[in-house]
Amino acid sequence: MATPTGETQPAKHQEVGHKSLLQSDALYQYILETSVYPREPQPMKELRRITAKHPWNLMTTSADEGQFLNLLLKLINAKNTMEIGVYTGYSLLSTALALPEDGKILALDINRENYEIGLPIIQKAGVAHKIDFREGPALPLLDQMLQDEKCHGSFDFIFVDADKDNYLNYHKRLIDLVKFGGVIGYDNTLWNGSLVAPADAPLRKYVRYYRDFVLELNKALAVDPRVEICQLPVGDGITLCRRIS
């Protein structure tokens, strides 16, 4: 979807909403044009435009959320990070640009082909050396890492934007891998507004299927004494969990 300024937006999930949960499209466009696009690094702008042409572009991180993650990582002085769910690498590039020169990202995804769409831009941006990309399911690798005491509490920040039906399985493992005071960010925790949609809302099949898993995650995080949480209506909803015990 092209905007009045010529920018291409990702496709909508379904009729209930889109990548912004704001009720006003005009207000969301104002945020993008005033605060996001003018500050968006050129490599991220280039990758966003390329990704917008991909048939699965609704999987990408929104531009305002990419900006949010970039600033958050700088605020917490993150150095060692993990990302589960990479797609073409927009949020990955946002992270890589925020980290110091010796920062590291363990990037996990089941599809290398999608990652390679953004890889030339990541390389051109001079941050590819920060990324350790692993293709395959994340859970077996997380279980392997948990067997190594050196991995416990070793990550400053972990971002999860992958299979929603495994979010709780990820959380059970990631809580031991993130350091005390470190942050885990779960994406899509408002799931396009479908969490409060009427029973007869025109939800796509996959949205309706994953809805219950997102609801289950939100309920679990709300009562988890090991973390402080903050759920924000940025992008499709992101919940930040700061480990405290």
Curated annotation (Swiss-Prot):
| Chain positions recorded as a divalent metal cation binding sites | 161, 187-188
| InterPro entries the record matches | Cation-dep_OMT (IPR050362), SAM-dependent_MTases_sf (IPR029063), SAM_O-MeTrfase (IPR002935)
SUPFAM superfamilies per the UniProt record, alphabetical: S-adenosyl-L-methionine-dependent methyltransferases
Tell me, which GO biological process terms does this entry list? lignin biosynthetic process; methylation
The protein's name is Caffeoyl-CoA O-methyltransferase
> What domain of life does the UniProt record list for this protein's source?
Eukaryota
Q: How is the cofactor bound?
A: Binds 1 divalent metal cation per subunit.
- A Pfam family this protein belongs to? Methyltransf_3
Q: What is its EC number?
A: 2.1.1.104
Q: Which GO terms describe its molecular function?
A: caffeoyl-CoA O-methyltransferase activity; metal ion binding
Q: Which cofactor does it need?
A: a divalent metal cation
Please give the catalytic activity noted in the UniProt record: (E)-caffeoyl-CoA + S-adenosyl-L-methionine = (E)-feruloyl-CoA + S-adenosyl-L-homocysteine + H(+)
| Segment forming the signal sequence | none
What residues does S-adenosyl-L-methionine bind to? Answer: 61, 83, 85-86, 91, 109, 138, 163
Q: Which family does it belong to?
A: Belongs to the class I-like SAM-binding methyltransferase superfamily. Cation-dependent O-methyltransferase family. CCoAMT subfamily.
Task: Work out whether the entry's keyword set contains Signal.
Answer: no
Q: Which organism is it from?
A: Zinnia elegans (Garden zinnia)
- Residues that bind substrate, according to the entry? 19, 161, 192
Tell me the function of this protein.
Answer: Methylates caffeoyl-CoA to feruloyl-CoA and 5-hydroxyferuloyl-CoA to sinapoyl-CoA. Plays a role in the synthesis of feruloylated polysaccharides. Involved in the reinforcement of the plant cell wall. Also involved in the responding to wounding or pathogen challenge by the increased formation of cell wall-bound ferulic acid polymers.
Q: Which key words are in the record? A: Lignin biosynthesis, Metal-binding, Methyltransferase, S-adenosyl-L-methionine, Transferase
Top-rank EC class of the record's enzyme: transferase
Q: In which pathway does it act?
A: Aromatic compound metabolism; phenylpropanoid biosynthesis
